[in-house]
Structures are given as C-alpha cells and as structure tokens.
Regions:
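Electrostatically charged, flexible surface regions
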Residues: 2-156
C-alpha cells in the first residue's frame, strides 16, 4: 500500500497550499452562518475552505500513479455469502461471487479498478441542512484538470 501513501500525500500537498494559517470557519464561530458569503458562494474552493466539502480518496493496493476526479459509482455484490452443509456441520463463506461496478466512466469504482487514485468531492452536510452544498457546486467540484485533480484545486 505504499502507493496509497504517496497518492494521499500528493493530494495533501496540493490542499495544504490552500488552507493558510486558519481556515475561515474554524470552530464554526457563527454556527450555521459560518459559510461562504454570497460573492464566494458559487466557488467550490470556498465551500472546501469552510469545511462544507471534503475530498474522499479511493486508492487501489497497486496504484498506477494516475489521478481521476469524478463522482462515486456504485458497487454491488452478487451472492455475497454461501452456506455449505457438510458431515461435520455447516460453514458460511463470506465473499462475493461477482462484483458489479456501476457508474459513469471516471467514477471512483472504474478508476480504482483501472489502478488509479479516485478523488471525489463530497458534501460534509446532508441535503436540506442549512450548510449543505448545492448540487451544481458539487458537480463543478468534481470536474478534473488534465492531471486528474479537481480543477478548483489546480486553479488556485
């Protein structure tokens, strides 16, 4: 898993250049009003700095050195258990017979299967929460640059 450490540290290196000495909403001094102002509202980086967006990394054990920012895909497991009855008793085996990945090309499931590090910008708060991030901002936050990193992270 040494590749996972390297990939994580490369993302941390990019992020640490943004944060500065003190994030703008450290300890949420104004409660639910601790969010980007109206002039900052439309920019994913401001939601990240206010801790309303987080970066989720999924990295395979054998990382190929690439990064891809994109949405989450879905992973389903078919026949996740099997029960075997034998002469000496019953055994239960846990382990999917088939793993099915769904989602668009560039989603985390497909990226990890291809050996890449998947970066997904996710909301910290659920929908309908006063600090939730609009869907359009999340969609923009998951756009990638030529190196596979979030465009908002690279444009700072």
């Amino acid at each position: 898993f040494s590749g996972a450490t390297e990939a994580t540290m490369r993302v941390v290196d990019r992020v640490s250049g943004l944060i500065g000495d003190a994030p703008p909403s450290l300890m949420r001094p104004m409660g639910q009003e601790s969010k980007p102002g109206m002039t900052e509202w439309q920019h994913p980086v401001n939601h990240f700095l206010h801790a309303n967006i987080l970066l989720n990394l999924n990295i395979p054990s054998e990382w190929n050195g690439s990064f891809t920012t994109g949405p989450h895909g879905a992973r389903r497991y078919k026949a996740p258990t099997s029960i075997n009855v034998g002469n000496t008793g019953m055994t239960v085996e846990v382990g999917a017979a088939t793993i099915v990945n769904e989602g668009p090309h560039g989603s985390d499931t497909h990226t990890v299967d291809a050996g890449g590090c998947a970066i997904t910008a996710m909301p910290t708060w659920p929908q309908l929460h006063p600090l939730s991030v609009p869907d359009g901002i999340l969609a923009e936050a998951n756009q990638r640059d030529g190196d596979g990193f979030p465009t908002w992270l690279s444009s700072q």
